[in-house]
């Protein structure tokens, strides 16, 4: 099949969840199909990034949003009732160019990643799949709860996003999302017809061969410019570390990931805490920690950081919200804790019981290998596209 894959950001480098998902879906689909990448971008794309995608794509086309027009397109979209999350990515001049380009390709199918990009392709006369991936309206609702000063604004944006998520549904033939938990969060009557297709993990790449002795007791990895990850890093240092100190446990903590702002970077001042920021090979950060701690209580989707840690035989302590999307068995594959006391006790258990530590490290990797293989997940997407049928709930 000739497939056009449309993204709201260029899929490489894969430092964000949507880019990771797009990259691997394109990579695997390209083995049996002709892929044409259409990427919307607010910035210029490096030659290195372009070259990374070309082995998998018949054509790669980047449409650059005109930055100087952003205030006007955001205002125009707002007056039309569009969510900011959509109008920020929707340049109407580029829209015509994108549509002309795709029509010229004459695809058998169009995959559109995220509602951000849906406005570019919703009217095209081809069969189309929309990947909701996460539920943006729920994410905005969470921000409204957390930010009292801007609550009214975030609530309005959440309502607009929910309305757009419902409206855009009818313009696509198939629909997918990253987890059943996210599907349940959608406020629409037809959500049971949305297929759940999780991300995967390259378990050969994400493997810890035990050649490196960890320097830190606890590690957290993530895009540190993302709100829920910032909150998690701060929670670890300001809530967990002091509680562990009360128990006479002086732990060393590593916080690693791209775009640490002032708030996260300031955590470096706490004794025993290292904020490394961007790491060229993030596997080194995972290998440098004994326990992966991710007490996340907000956010959306499937947390790939947990899957990567489990794949590297790193026992994980996380929240029930995060594990709901993963589906691991608490106490066997992963430790689930939702209070400071329970999280601290989970950490102590793993620090004090080497046998339990090893059992969970191995069980976690086995679970990820069995349930989160990229090939298996993309095959589900391929089957949905080839059969050209709407997903029917089991």
Regions found by a protein language model. Give the residues of each.
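Acceptor-binding helix/loop patch of EC 2.4 sugar-transfer enzymes
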Residues: 8, 67, 71-88, 128-167, ...
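Donor nucleotide-sugar binding/catalytic pocket of nucleotide-sugar-dependent glycosyltransferases
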Residues: 129, 137, 154-208
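Acidic donor-binding loop of glycosyltransferase active sites
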Residues: 173, 287-301, 312-315
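Conserved catalytic-core segment of nucleotide-activated headgroup transferases in glycan assembly
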Residues: 196-288
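Short hydrophobic beta-strand element within catalytic cores of glycosyltransferases
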Residues: 305-308, 315-319, 335
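Conserved acidic donor-binding segment of nucleotide-sugar-dependent glycosyltransferases
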Residues: 334-341, 349-354
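A short, well-ordered alpha-helix in the C-terminal region of glycosyltransferases
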Residues: 349, 356-370, 377-383
């Amino acid at each position: 099949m000739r497939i056009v894959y449309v993204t709201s950001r260029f899929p490489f480098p894969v430092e964000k969840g949507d880019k990771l998902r797009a990259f691997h879906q394109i990579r695997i689909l390209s083995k049996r199909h002709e892929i044409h990448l259409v990427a919307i971008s607010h910035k210029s794309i490096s030659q290195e990034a372009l070259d990374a995608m070309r082995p998998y794509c018949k054509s790669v086309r980047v449409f650059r949003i005109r930055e100087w027009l952003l205030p006007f397109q955001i205002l125009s979209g707002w007056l039309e009732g569009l969510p900011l999350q959509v109008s920020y990515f929707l340049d109407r001049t580029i829209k015509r160019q994108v549509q002309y380009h795709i029509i010229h390709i004459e695809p058998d199918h169009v995959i559109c990643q995220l509602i951000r990009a849906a406005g570019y392709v919703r009217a095209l006369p081809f069969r189309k799949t929309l990947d909701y991936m996460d539920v943006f309206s729920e994410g905005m609702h969470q921000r409204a709860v957390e930010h009292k000063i801007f609550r009214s604004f975030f609530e309005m944006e959440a309502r607009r996003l929910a309305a757009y998520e419902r409206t855009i549904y009818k313009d696509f033939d198939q629909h997918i999302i990253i987890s059943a938990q996210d599907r349940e969060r959608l406020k629409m009557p037809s959500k049971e017809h949305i297929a759940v297709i999780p991300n995967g993990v390259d378990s050969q790449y994400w493997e810890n061969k035990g050649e490196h002795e960890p320097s830190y007791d606890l590690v957290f990895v993530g895009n540190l410019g993302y709100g829920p990850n910032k909150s998690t890093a701060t929670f670890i240092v300001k809530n967990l570390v002091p509680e562990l100190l009360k128990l006479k446990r002086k732990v060393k903590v590593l916080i690693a990931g791209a775009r640490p702002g002032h708030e996260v970077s300031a955590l470096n001042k706490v004794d025993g805490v290292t904020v490394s920021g961007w790491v060229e090979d993030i596997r080194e950060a995972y290998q440098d920690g004994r326990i992966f701690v991710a007490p996340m209580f907000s956010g959306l989707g499937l947390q790939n950081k947990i899957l990567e840690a489990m794949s590297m035989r790193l026992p994980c302590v996380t929240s029930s919200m995060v594990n709901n999307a993963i589906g691991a068995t608490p106490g066997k594959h992963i430790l689930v804790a939702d209070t400071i006391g329970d999280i601290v006790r989970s950490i102590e258990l793993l620090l004090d019981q080497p046998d339990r530590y090893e059992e969970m490290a191995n069980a976690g990797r086995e679970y990820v290998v069995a349930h989160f293989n990229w090939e298996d997940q993309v095959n589900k997407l391929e089957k949905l596209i080839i059969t050209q049928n709407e997903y029917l709930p089991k």
